[in-house]
A protein has these predicted regions:
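Hinge/lid segment of periplasmic solute-binding proteins
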Residues: 92-140, 152, 159-161, 276
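Short amphipathic alpha-helical coupling segments at ligand-binding clamshell hinges
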Residues: 47-48, 87, 156, 218-223, ...
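Extracytoplasmic/periplasmic solute-binding protein
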Residues: 132-136, 141, 161-211, 253
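Short, solvent-exposed loop/beta-turn-alpha elements that line the ligand-binding surface or hinge
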Residues: 109-117, 177, 198-222, 268, ...
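Extracytoplasmic/periplasmic substrate-recognition and gating elements
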Residues: 267-333
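Conserved N-terminal structural module of periplasmic/extracytoplasmic solute-binding proteins
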Residues: 2, 9-94, 399, 407-419
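Long, aromatic- and glycine/proline-rich binding clefts that accommodate carbohydrate-like moieties
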Residues: 329-382, 387-389, 415-419
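Glycine-centered hinge/linker elements that transmit conformational signals in sensory
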Residues: 164, 207-238
Length: 419
C-alpha cells in the first residue's frame, strides 16, 4: 500500500506527546502506555487522548508519531524490548509477520467486546487461530468521477475509456482513470480485478480457491483492448500514481481511485463524493478492492515493560469502544470499524460511502498471500511491475499476465499454511 526508515533514529525523528491522567499510579509500577502510529493516525490519536486522558485509570498514554506508514513499519520491524511500543496501530497484513517474529501478542476479548464488530473483521487480525488486536478503522479505496467532465456514473470499464477518448483533445485530459490513493499495488487492485485479474480466487461460498489463478488470456486481452493502442499505452490508465491527485483536482482526469483517508481534500475542492467501485468490463460487475481493517495491535513488549494490563485495557476501553472510535474518527475521517460508531450521527456521508463501496466489492487483504514471494516476487512488487512492463516498456500484455498469474498462484498456495 502507499499505504506509506527509522530504527532507533526514527524515534528521534518522530514526535510524541504524553498525556497524564488524574489517577495516582500504583507505587513502583510501570504506568506509561506507549502507542506507535503513522503520520495521520498519530497526531489525531494524540488530540483525542489530550481531550480525554482517563481511558485507563492510573496510566498515562504516550503516542509516538512516525513520518509515514512505511517508516512506522520499518521502525516496528527493528524494534527491541527496550525501544518497542506497547501497542502499534498498523495494517492487518502486519499480523502474520508480527506473530511469527514474536513481536505481537495474542489478546482474548469478551463476548461483549466482540459483539461490537463484524466477525469477519477479526479474521483480518487473526493468525493461526489467535487474535492480535482490535479493529480500528476500515481501509479501502473507491472511485469518484468529475461531474463537470462526465454526467453520470459509468456502467462499464469500456464506457470510461470511450468517454476519455471523446474528451481527451477538447478538455486537455492527462489520463482517463488514475490511482490517487493507495498506490499501484494496494489501490490499483480494483483495476486489475475490473479487467479480470484478482490476487486470489474465491468460490461461491466465499472460500479461497487454491491452485488456481486468474485467466491470463482474458486479463491480457482486456488490457490490450482498453488500455493499449498497438504496443503503446492509449493514455487512459497511467502506470504510476504520480500526479494523479493533482490532475484530478485540476479537472484533467475524469475518474480517480481515492483513499478513504483523503476524501476531505476532494470535498474542500467542491467534488461530489459519488463513490463507487471501479466498474468491470460487463455491466453489473465491479473490480474488487481490498477492504480490510487497520488494527490496534498488542505487542509482546508490553509484558516486558510491565504495562500489559494497562495496554489491554486501552485496547478495549478506547480503541474498541463506541466513544473512542467516534472521537477518533471525527479527526481521522475514515470509516470506523465499531458498529456503534458506524451508526453515530457524526459519521459523514463520505465515510458511509466508502463503507458501502467496500460492502459491494471489498475483499479481505490477506497478508499471508500478498506478502509471500514464493512465486518469485510478492504481490506488492509484482503488481506495479506488470503495469510498467506493459504500459511503459511495451511488453506483451498476455505474456506478462501469464507470468503474473503464476506468481500469484504460487504465493497463495504458499501462504495457505499461515492462515
Amino acid at each position: 500500500m502507499n499505504k506509506k526508515r527509522f530504527g532507533i533514529a526514527g524515534v528521534i525523528a518522530a514526535f510524541a506527546l504524553a498525556v497524564s491522567t488524574l489517577v495516582a499510579p500504583t507505587a513502583g509500577a510501570a504506568t506509561e502506555i506507549v502507542v506507535w502510529a503513522d503520520e495521520s493516525r498519530g497526531p489525531n490519536l494524540t488530540k483525542v487522548i489530550a481531550a480525554k486522558g482517563d481511558w485507563v485509570s492510573g496510566y498515562t498514554v504516550k503516542v509516538v508519531t512516525f513520518s509515514s506508514f512505511d517508516a512506522l513499519k520499518d521502525a516496528f520491524d527493528k524494534a527491541t524490548d527496550a525501544s518497542g511500543p506497547d501497542i502499534v496501530v498498523g495494517g492487518n497484513d502486519w499480523v502474520p509477520t508480527g506473530a511469527k517474529s514474536g513481536k505481537l501478542a495474542p489478546i482474548a476479548l469478551t463476548a461483549a467486546v466482540k459483539a461490537r464488530f463484524n466477525p469477519t473483521q477479526f479474521l483480518d487480525l487473526t493468525y493461526k487461530g489467535k487474535l492480535y488486536g482490535v479493529p480500528v478503522d476500515i481501509n479501502n479505496v473507491a472511485m469518484i468521477y468529475n461531474t463537470k467532465l462526465v454526467s453520470s456514473a459509468p456502467k462499464t470499464f469500456g464506457e470510461m475509456v470511450t468517454n476519455y477518448k471523446s474528451l481527451k483533445a477538447s478538455k486537455g485530459l492527462k489520463a482517463g482513470l488514475c490511482i490517487a490513493g493507495g498506490g499501484m499495488s494496494w489501490g490499483a487492485h480494483s483495476v486489475f480485478s475490473a479487467l479480470g485479474a484478482d490476487a486470489y480466487q474465491f468460490n461461491s461460498r466465499g472460500g479461497v480457491v487454491y491452485g488456481r489463478a486468474f485467466s491470463a488470456t482474458t486479463f491480457g486481452q482486456n488490457v490490450r483492448k482498453y488500455l493499449m493502442d498497438g504496443k503503446k499505452s492509449n493514455g487512459f490508465f497511467p502506470a504510476t500514481d504520480t500526479g494523479c491527485k493533482d490532475n484530478f483536482l485540476a479537472g484533467t482526469v475524469p475518474y480517480a481511485v481515492i483513499g478513504n483517508w483523503e476524501w476531505a481534500d476532494y470535498v474542500a475542492k467542491g467534488f461530489t463524493m459519488n463513490l463507487m467501485p471501479v466498474p468491470g468490463v460487463t455491466e453489473g460487475n465491479y473490480g474488487k478492492m481490498f477492504g480490510s481493517v487497520s488494527g490496534a495491535l498488542l505487542t509482546t513488549f508490553a509484558a516486558k515493560h510491565g504495562t500489559e494490563a494497562g495496554a489491554k485495557s486501552l485496547l478495549t476501553n478506547f480503541f474498541a469502544s463506541t466513544d473512542g472510535q467516534v472521537r477518533y474518527q471525527l479527526l481521522e475521517k475514515r470509516p470506523p470499524a465499531e458498529k456503534g460508531a458506524q451508526a453515530d450521527s457524526s459519521v459523514s456521508a463520505a465515510q458511509r460511502g466508502f463503507g458501502s463501496a467496500a460492502s459491494l466489492a471489498g475483499i479481505p487483504q490477506v497478508g499471508a498471500f500478498l506478502n509471500s514471494n514464493k512465486g518469485g516476487a510478492n504481490y506488492w512488487d509484482s503488481a506495479p511491475a506488470y503495469w510498467t512492463a506493459v504500459l511503459i516498456d511495451g511488453k506483451d500484455a498476455v505474456k506478462e499476465a501469464s507470468k503474473l498469474a503464476s506468481i500469484w498462484r504460487v504465493n497463495v498456495e504458499a501462504g495457505k499454511g499461515d492462515l
